[in-house]
From Swiss-Prot:
One of its GO terms (cellular component) is cytoplasm. It comes from Serratia proteamaculans (strain 568). This is UPF0235 protein Spro_4033. It comes from the Bacteria. NCBIfam families: DUF167 family protein (TIGR00251), PRK05090.1 (NF003466). HAMAP family: UPF0235. It holds the Pfam family DUF167. Gene3D superfamilies: YggU-like (3.30.1200.10). Transmembrane segments: none annotated.
Amino acid sequence: MSAVTPVLDGLAIRLYIQPKASRDQIVGLHGDELKVAITAPPVDGQANAHLIKFLAKQFKVAKGNVTIEKGELGRHKQLRIVNPQQIPDVVAALIE
């Protein structure tokens, strides 16, 4: 499975998260996952909440349309983004 896979209602994305980064950004490929750097620390779910907010803004969807399917407690996550209104260039290049 690649980092970004189109599914029936949107996109399934496999991520590698770098918490406590200097800025929020979609970095690019990290092995077979998409690396995303976020500024929030991995404490009490802050990083997950910040990640959902950041990705919702990048894909122009409501926060409720971004769900963590796997990896709630780790750096390796699988997310689903329902009906993205915009796809960032880094992600668009990875869609198979």
